Amino acid sequence: MNKIISFICLLSIYVLNIQSQTIIKTTYNELSSPDGKYLFEVYQKEFTDGTKQLYYTLSYEGKSVIEESELGVLIENQLFESALGIPNDSCKVWGANLTLKGNKQNQVNNTWKPLYGERSIVKDYYNELVLNFVKEEQEEGKQIDGYNKNRFYMMSFVIRAYDEGVAFRYHFPEATNGLFLHIVGEQTQFTLPKGTMAYYERWAQGPYELKPLENWSDECERPLTMKLSNGLFVSLAEAEMIDYARMKFRLNETKANTLQASLYSSVDVITPYSTPWRVILVADREIDLIGNNDIILNLNPENKVSNSSWIKPGKVIRATNMKQGEVLKCVDFAAERGLQYIHIDAGWYGPEMKMSSDATSVSENRDLDIPAIINYAEKKGIGLWVYVNQRALVQQLDELLPLYKKWGIKGIKFGFVQIGNQHWSTWLHDAIKKCAEYEIMVDIHDEYRPTGFSRTYPNLLTQEGIRGNEEMPDATHNTILPFTRFLCGAGDYTICYYNNRIKTTHAHQLAMAVVYYSPLQFLYWYDEPSAYKGEPEIEFFDKVKTVWDDTQVINGKIGEYVTIARRSGKDWFLGTIGNTDARTLDTPLSFLDKDKKYLASIYTDDDKIKTKTKVRVTRLIVDSASTFHFQLKASGGCAVHFTPASVAEIKMYRKYKKQPL
């Protein structure tokens, strides 16, 4: 860490030095998105002292998004150079003598079908520009002891421009001299227009604050969503972070309105190697950020699990009472209520924070028989997930996986996973790969945030990295999440229903099952089966899906409200959640098939209903020309299930006629 700080100080001195230099040459390249809305300009300035610096700008529909910002990787390789008998690099900053040798442009336009997702078909359409640089020049006659003793490096800067956003990264081709790379940071900057406001979040399970780009107490999590003074909305994210160090954003100490890519730790790599993607999404309307989140998956390699038939998303209830009889009641409840899994959480094999706890067997003080539970559950079509803390996973993973497969366990929830540095990032993704070998699905809890790895290893169904119902946030927080955290992938919010600590209405909780995407969706997080007293609206949880054929964002304003509609087969599900203010909201149903009538089962808050949950169930006939007029309570919401209406249903139920709901 001290080495990283010293390099940051050195970089600040270097920047101040080049600012006092005269530019003698500028080399420009540019790349546009297929629809022409994004324009990415990248250029290298050469100064009078011989140093060079790479910069970029980004505009969207002619409006400035990223003003002149530095690019580059900070590498400290003198130790490796000395060990191989290669002369040390004398540059104060590693990229100061990079020379552009050529470029290559490419266009890709295809689609792919995910195993599961928010859409059954994903468009992958982008323009690509690759700039190839060299550092130093090859000299003849230095091929000694089987390797090249030149101080010679190659680096490519790769840019992709999609209609959905722009991404870039640094690629290092295979070295000819055997050198490793010791990366201590990045020069990567994001200079935003003056007046930008950011949804600052200090840690992955933290609250949000809307703040200017100044006086931050610490770094900020990604994705980072911002409002620009020119009316645009921007989100900065990371993709394909597998064996690198996690990036966050910190304020640049010497340049106003500038965010610096900040790595958790240094990184040691062997070439060829590509850093993670730095991703920029831009939209005129904040709801379009949500609709463009496929870019994160597109920036990751395709599915590497050849036989994926065992990977089955679904809904799950946690057994809060870890006694055999109570767990079996959860199995019965899951089977009756259309769930697919039950989950046994922390403590089943002993104190989770003790290295001595053995996850190959049930703790002596627990009345649990795991094989018997699995046998009982399988007869009812229910699978079992179990929690295992990282302390046990680190010691026992290779022993646990064949045992759990033998028992019939379907998935593991990884608990309290250390993340951030290169070591633990690599360990975690390797652990997911190992789970795939034994046909075991994964849910990662606590601070991990996705960067698209579920495309490559879809047994990673979901992850926490979210302030959800374990912390019981308020409704305003909930209306920020779709525009921030959920841009990077599925989130395990752990939805509750009956628990009296929730700070929203019950219809709000119902709607979150649609608004929040999670292929493994926890419902009833703090609840027990006995809490259910026949409330009719629970049928919505029974029927709602966790993966989708289509997703459409109908309306929304960050921190105020959001409405999302999702389709599974012929059925549509709609969820609306509002913040702590009451409001009226018009919701057009134009996403429904034209020339088709639907039976809408509508779930809204109503204090007149004589149940503990106060949710009204209304059934009406609608079509694509209908517009619902919702009256949301403070911290409220509504949920709707649309099914194609039969002739009998059209006769039985009245048509919606614009009445308030």
Where are these regions (language model features)?
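Solvent-exposed beta-strand/loop surfaces of large extracellular or lumenal domains
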Residues: 120, 141-145, 200-208, 602-625
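Carbohydrate-binding surface patches
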Residues: 558-596, 638-639
